[in-house]
Protein backbone atom coordinates (compact mmCIF):
# COMPACT_ATOMS: atom_id res chain seq x y z
CA UNK A 1 0.00 0.00 0.00
CA UNK A 2 1.39 3.40 -0.95
CA UNK A 3 1.06 6.42 1.25
CA UNK A 4 -0.50 9.58 -0.17
CA UNK A 5 1.93 12.47 -0.45
CA UNK A 6 0.89 15.35 1.82
CA UNK A 7 2.89 18.56 1.47
CA UNK A 8 2.78 21.54 3.82
CA UNK A 9 4.12 24.79 2.37
CA UNK A 10 4.79 27.64 4.79
CA UNK A 11 5.14 31.24 3.63
CA UNK A 12 4.82 34.50 5.63
CA UNK A 13 2.21 36.18 3.41
CA UNK A 14 0.53 35.05 0.23
CA UNK A 15 0.90 38.19 -1.88
CA UNK A 16 1.70 38.74 -5.54
CA UNK A 17 5.49 38.21 -5.43
CA UNK A 18 7.38 35.44 -7.18
CA UNK A 19 7.78 33.20 -4.13
CA UNK A 20 4.13 33.69 -3.21
CA UNK A 21 2.70 32.96 -6.65
CA UNK A 22 5.00 29.94 -6.93
CA UNK A 23 3.69 28.68 -3.60
CA UNK A 24 0.10 29.26 -4.74
CA UNK A 25 0.68 27.45 -8.05
CA UNK A 26 2.37 24.46 -6.43
CA UNK A 27 -0.40 24.20 -3.83
CA UNK A 28 -2.99 23.85 -6.59
CA UNK A 29 -0.76 21.61 -8.74
CA UNK A 30 -0.38 19.19 -5.83
CA UNK A 31 -4.12 19.04 -5.21
CA UNK A 32 -4.81 18.44 -8.92
CA UNK A 33 -2.38 15.51 -8.88
CA UNK A 34 -3.89 13.53 -6.00
CA UNK A 35 -1.57 14.90 -3.33
CA UNK A 36 -2.63 16.51 -0.10
CA UNK A 37 -1.90 20.23 -0.25
CA UNK A 38 -1.60 22.34 2.88
CA UNK A 39 -0.59 25.98 3.09
CA UNK A 40 0.31 27.87 6.28
CA UNK A 41 0.44 31.66 6.05
CA UNK A 42 -0.47 34.76 8.03
CA UNK A 43 -2.59 36.20 5.21
CA UNK A 44 -2.21 37.99 1.90
CA UNK A 45 -4.04 39.01 -1.24
CA UNK A 46 -3.95 35.57 -2.92
CA UNK A 47 -5.83 33.83 -0.11
CA UNK A 48 -9.19 34.75 -1.63
CA UNK A 49 -8.25 32.82 -4.80
CA UNK A 50 -7.29 29.58 -3.06
CA UNK A 51 -9.64 26.71 -3.88
CA UNK A 52 -10.43 25.82 -0.29
CA UNK A 53 -11.95 22.48 -1.30
CA UNK A 54 -8.55 21.51 -2.76
CA UNK A 55 -5.97 23.28 -0.56
CA UNK A 56 -6.24 23.33 3.23
CA UNK A 57 -5.36 26.79 4.49
CA UNK A 58 -3.77 27.19 7.93
CA UNK A 59 -3.70 30.72 9.31
CA UNK A 60 -0.77 31.28 11.66
CA UNK A 61 1.50 34.25 12.48
CA UNK A 62 4.35 32.64 10.50
CA UNK A 63 5.48 36.08 9.31
CA UNK A 64 6.75 36.94 12.79
CA UNK A 65 10.43 36.91 13.79
CA UNK A 66 9.45 36.94 17.47
CA UNK A 67 11.09 33.86 19.08
CA UNK A 68 8.01 33.20 21.22
CA UNK A 69 5.76 33.17 18.15
CA UNK A 70 8.26 30.99 16.27
CA UNK A 71 8.02 28.49 19.13
CA UNK A 72 4.20 28.80 19.19
CA UNK A 73 4.09 28.17 15.43
CA UNK A 74 6.35 25.14 15.86
CA UNK A 75 3.92 23.43 18.22
CA UNK A 76 0.86 24.26 16.13
CA UNK A 77 2.61 22.95 13.01
CA UNK A 78 3.51 19.73 14.85
CA UNK A 79 -0.18 19.18 15.58
CA UNK A 80 -1.14 19.74 11.93
CA UNK A 81 1.71 17.53 10.71
CA UNK A 82 0.56 14.60 12.83
CA UNK A 83 -3.16 15.25 12.30
CA UNK A 84 -2.96 15.40 8.49
CA UNK A 85 -0.04 12.99 8.05
CA UNK A 86 2.19 15.56 6.37
CA UNK A 87 5.22 13.96 4.65
CA UNK A 88 7.10 17.06 3.45
CA UNK A 89 7.42 20.48 5.10
CA UNK A 90 8.47 23.18 2.62
CA UNK A 91 9.52 26.56 4.08
CA UNK A 92 9.81 29.54 1.75
CA UNK A 93 11.17 32.19 4.11
CA UNK A 94 13.51 32.44 7.07
CA UNK A 95 11.16 33.16 9.99
CA UNK A 96 8.76 30.32 9.18
CA UNK A 97 11.72 28.10 8.28
CA UNK A 98 12.79 28.09 11.94
CA UNK A 99 9.35 26.86 13.02
CA UNK A 100 9.34 24.28 10.22
CA UNK A 101 12.84 23.10 11.10
CA UNK A 102 11.96 22.48 14.75
CA UNK A 103 8.65 20.86 13.75
CA UNK A 104 10.52 18.55 11.35
CA UNK A 105 12.91 17.49 14.13
CA UNK A 106 9.99 16.69 16.44
CA UNK A 107 7.94 14.86 13.79
CA UNK A 108 10.86 13.38 11.81
CA UNK A 109 9.41 14.64 8.54
CA UNK A 110 11.36 15.79 5.48
CA UNK A 111 12.25 19.48 5.63
CA UNK A 112 12.74 21.41 2.37
CA UNK A 113 13.45 25.11 1.77
CA UNK A 114 13.51 27.44 -1.19
CA UNK A 115 16.18 30.16 -1.09
CA UNK A 116 14.57 32.96 -3.13
CA UNK A 117 16.88 35.93 -2.64
CA UNK A 118 20.08 37.27 -1.17
CA UNK A 119 19.95 38.09 2.52
CA UNK A 120 21.91 40.72 4.40
CA UNK A 121 24.48 39.09 6.68
CA UNK A 122 26.63 41.88 8.11
CA UNK A 123 26.86 40.15 11.48
CA UNK A 124 27.44 36.54 12.47
CA UNK A 125 24.07 36.52 14.22
CA UNK A 126 22.30 37.53 11.02
CA UNK A 127 24.25 34.96 9.02
CA UNK A 128 23.26 32.27 11.53
CA UNK A 129 19.61 33.38 11.29
CA UNK A 130 19.80 33.14 7.48
CA UNK A 131 21.48 29.72 7.65
CA UNK A 132 18.16 28.08 8.48
CA UNK A 133 17.48 28.03 4.75
CA UNK A 134 20.37 25.56 4.38
CA UNK A 135 19.51 23.25 7.26
CA UNK A 136 16.97 21.38 5.15
CA UNK A 137 17.45 18.00 3.53
CA UNK A 138 16.96 19.82 0.21
CA UNK A 139 17.48 23.52 -0.49
CA UNK A 140 16.15 24.85 -3.77
CA UNK A 141 17.92 27.90 -5.21
CA UNK A 142 15.61 30.08 -7.28
CA UNK A 143 18.24 30.91 -9.92
CA UNK A 144 21.86 30.34 -10.89
CA UNK A 145 22.68 33.68 -9.25
CA UNK A 146 21.18 32.53 -5.92
CA UNK A 147 22.95 29.18 -6.27
CA UNK A 148 26.29 31.01 -6.63
CA UNK A 149 25.41 33.36 -3.75
CA UNK A 150 24.76 30.38 -1.47
CA UNK A 151 27.99 28.61 -2.45
CA UNK A 152 30.07 31.76 -2.00
CA UNK A 153 28.56 33.06 1.24
CA UNK A 154 27.12 30.06 3.11
CA UNK A 155 29.55 27.30 2.20
CA UNK A 156 30.12 26.44 5.86
CA UNK A 157 26.45 25.42 6.18
CA UNK A 158 26.53 23.08 3.18
CA UNK A 159 27.28 19.39 3.57
CA UNK A 160 27.35 16.23 1.47
CA UNK A 161 24.27 14.89 3.27
CA UNK A 162 22.17 17.88 2.27
CA UNK A 163 21.32 18.71 -1.30
CA UNK A 164 21.35 22.09 -3.04
CA UNK A 165 19.52 22.30 -6.36
CA UNK A 166 18.89 25.21 -8.71
CA UNK A 167 15.64 25.86 -10.57
CA UNK A 168 14.97 28.68 -13.00
Feature locations, PLM:
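Membrane-interface segments of envelope glycosyltransferases acting on lipid-linked substrates or membrane lipids
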Residues: 1-168
